From Swiss-Prot:
Binding positions (Mg(2+)): 104, 108
Name recorded for this polypeptide: Nudix hydrolase 3
CDD domains: NUDIX_CoAse_Nudt7
Key words of the record: Hydrolase, Magnesium, Manganese, Metal-binding
Enzyme class label: hydrolase
Gene expressing this chain: ndx-3
UniProt keyword Translocase present: no
Superkingdom as given in the UniProt entry: Eukaryota
Family annotation (PANTHER family): MITOCHONDRIAL COENZYME A DIPHOSPHATASE NUDT8 (PTHR12992:SF11), NUDIX HYDROLASE (PTHR12992)
GO biological process per UniProt: nucleoside diphosphate metabolic process
Gene Ontology MF term list: coenzyme A diphosphatase activity; magnesium ion binding; manganese ion binding
InterPro entries associated with the record: CoAse, NUDIX_hydrolase-like_dom_sf, NUDIX_hydrolase_CS, NUDIX_hydrolase_dom, NUDIX_hydrolase_NudL_CS
Location of the Nudix hydrolase domain: 50-190
Function: Probably mediates the hydrolysis of some nucleoside diphosphate derivatives.
Length: 240
């Protein structure tokens, strides 16, 4: 089930707002440093490459609008097929979380490390089954022309698109989950306003894209740190 956030948020005018201004990185790091560094008690060891992953949350200004880049996984994959996510994957032995995120981004969509300015690490996110954790790395792509020369791995990625941050904030909502063992609520984001930079030939791309699950949790973290004066919430997320 999906529930909208408070009416107060829906009344906030965030159109045409700039989020990646001159002091954006410094403010982001200041907000990040104010968060307690404690880890989720169920997180697996960061040194276990078999159960540790990292992703890049790429920030980029497209057509004058500050945006977040996402990918849609190929429908031909065995797991999480067709889901919207950030580029990333499992850590190789000896890699740092940043190195993994940048390597996977290059392998999936062809954006090289030199094009990304790393802003910082968010709290690792744990999967409900507690079998692996994912560290989100926030990075800024200063030149949007990078998106004109994507080299997409069609075995893994169907589409690459960007969603303006003001659109994400306006469309933010909550999704309630219930299983035999637990109930929980996670942030989710439905967008009808996005720019497609790549889509595989003959593959259908829906007019609404939903960011939810772990990707929604990671996006929620990033928006909280980027725009705490606009993206206001009282949701306690149990997965980081």
């Amino acid at each position: 089930m999906r529930y909208g956030l408070s009416a107060q948020r829906s009344l906030i005018n965030v159109c045409s707002r700039r989020f990646f201004g001159k002091d954006a990185k410094e403010q982001f790091l200041k907000n990040l440093s104010s968060i307690p560094a404690s880890k989720h008690p169920r997180l697996v060891s960061d040194s276990d490459a078999n159960s540790a992953m990292s992703v890049l949350i790429p920030l980029v200004t497209v057509d004058g609008r500050d945006s977040v880049l996402l990918t849609k996984r190929s429908i031909h994959l065995r797991s999480h097929r067709g889901e919207v996510c950030f580029p990333g994957g499992r850590m190789d032995p000896g890699e740092t979380t940043t190195e993994t995120a940048l390597r996977e981004t290059f392998e999936e969509i062809g954006v090289n490390a030199e094009s990304v300015e790393i802003w910082g690490h968010l709290k690792s996110v744990i999967r409900r089954q507690a079998d692996f954790n994912v560290t989100p790395i926030v990075g800024y792509i200063s030149d949007e022309r990078v998106l004109e020369n994507l080299v997409v791995n069609s075995d893994e990625v169907q589409a690459v698109f960007t969603i303006p941050i003001d659109e994400l904030i306006k469309k933010a909502g909550l999704t309630k989950f219930q299983s035999k063992r637990m109930k929980y609520t996670l942030p989710s984001f439905d967008s009808t306003e996005f720019k497609v930079h790549h889509n595989a030939p003959n593959e259908y791309l829906h007019s609404t894209q939903r960011v939810w699950g772990l990707s929604g949790v990671m996006l929620h973290q990033a928006l909280t740190l980027l725009n705490p004066d606009v993206y206001k919430h009282d949701l306690i997320v149990k997965f980081f």
